[in-house]
């Protein structure tokens, strides 16, 4: 008998729930269309569902007619986007994750105090673009540990660092250690910039890896945190696949013996997880599912002020 060990927590985090609810509530309150700058979260199933209900996803505010309503995605935006919205008389609703907003505020604050800011993250990720936009002249993005050796700052320069919220804890630890060795005076926030949900999902997966021989991460290929989950397994020599649909699960799994772990990125709907489990049961009829509870998440974020009445 083979087992699927189903990680808990998995799937939607509080920031994703809030962001999706913002678009849903806006559609209920004002009707279609509701424009959304960037995909509200990085999951094709979520985006397609909201499109069917009247959301229009755009990358450039010039695609939003003057006076219309626009929602900013959970990943955040640079300040100039907000300014453009005001100039064009757009009614904007901010669905930026509360934890991302916290990093925006910290970057703005420390830049105003004269610090140079090191932002650990992927330069092209929309979250990093938004954070860097708070103080572009003061922010340097570090993507990998090798970048630390090339930083130009003298020891006399005050330094502050933060990270993208969806990074690998392994990578962040390595880069942070390199920063502290090179710049012992560097400071950061009292708690990690990597969000609680990213940490929980990675640590939950890590805790079951000694018990399994294969991992499925249910999530979108565009999802940073889903990709990092796949890497958690691969770095520990456990084969892992990132899939976003039961159609992506092949009979390849029959080539592997032993138990299977399943987790899901923070923007993955639970019904997709369950449909993937059903597909595995078709391939392995005697498969047993066991839930492994690593942590209980009860975080809830309030809606933006525009939607509170």
Curated annotation (Swiss-Prot):
Gene3D superfamilies: 3.40.50.11270, 4-hydroxy-3-methylbut-2-enyl diphosphate reductase, catalytic domain (3.40.1010.20). It catalyses: isopentenyl diphosphate + 2 oxidized [2Fe-2S]-[ferredoxin] + H2O = (2E)-4-hydroxy-3-methylbut-2-enyl diphosphate + 2 reduced [2Fe-2S]-[ferredoxin] + 2 H(+); dimethylallyl diphosphate + 2 oxidized [2Fe-2S]-[ferredoxin] + H2O = (2E)-4-hydroxy-3-methylbut-2-enyl diphosphate + 2 reduced [2Fe-2S]-[ferredoxin] + 2 H(+). Binds 1 [4Fe-4S] cluster per subunit. Isopentenyl diphosphate binds at residues 42, 75, 125, 223-225, 267. Its cofactor is [4Fe-4S] cluster. The keyword Cytoplasm does not apply. The keyword Disulfide bond does not apply. Coiled coil: none annotated. Pfam families: LYTB. Dimethylallyl diphosphate binds at residues 42, 75, 125, 223-225, 267. It comes from the Bacteria. The active site is at 127 (proton donor). GO terms for biological process: dimethylallyl diphosphate biosynthetic process; isopentenyl diphosphate biosynthetic process, methylerythritol 4-phosphate pathway; terpenoid biosynthetic process. Its EC number is 1.17.7.4. One of its GO terms (molecular function) is metal ion binding. [4Fe-4S] cluster binds at residues 13, 97, 195. Keywords: 4Fe-4S, Iron, Iron-sulfur, Isoprene biosynthesis, Metal-binding, Oxidoreductase. (2E)-4-hydroxy-3-methylbut-2-enyl diphosphate binds at residues 42, 75, 125, 165, 223-225, 267. Pathway: Isoprenoid biosynthesis; dimethylallyl diphosphate biosynthesis; dimethylallyl diphosphate from (2E)-4-hydroxy-3-methylbutenyl diphosphate: step 1/1; Isoprenoid biosynthesis; isopentenyl diphosphate biosynthesis via DXP pathway; isopentenyl diphosphate from 1-deoxy-D-xylulose 5-phosphate: step 6/6. Belongs to the IspH family. Catalyzes the conversion of 1-hydroxy-2-methyl-2-(E)-butenyl 4-diphosphate (HMBPP) into a mixture of isopentenyl diphosphate (IPP) and dimethylallyl diphosphate (DMAPP). Acts in the terminal step of the DOXP/MEP pathway for isoprenoid precursor biosynthesis. This is 4-hydroxy-3-methylbut-2-enyl diphosphate reductase. It comes from Chlamydia caviae (strain ATCC VR-813 / DSM 19441 / 03DC25 / GPIC). The gene is ispH.
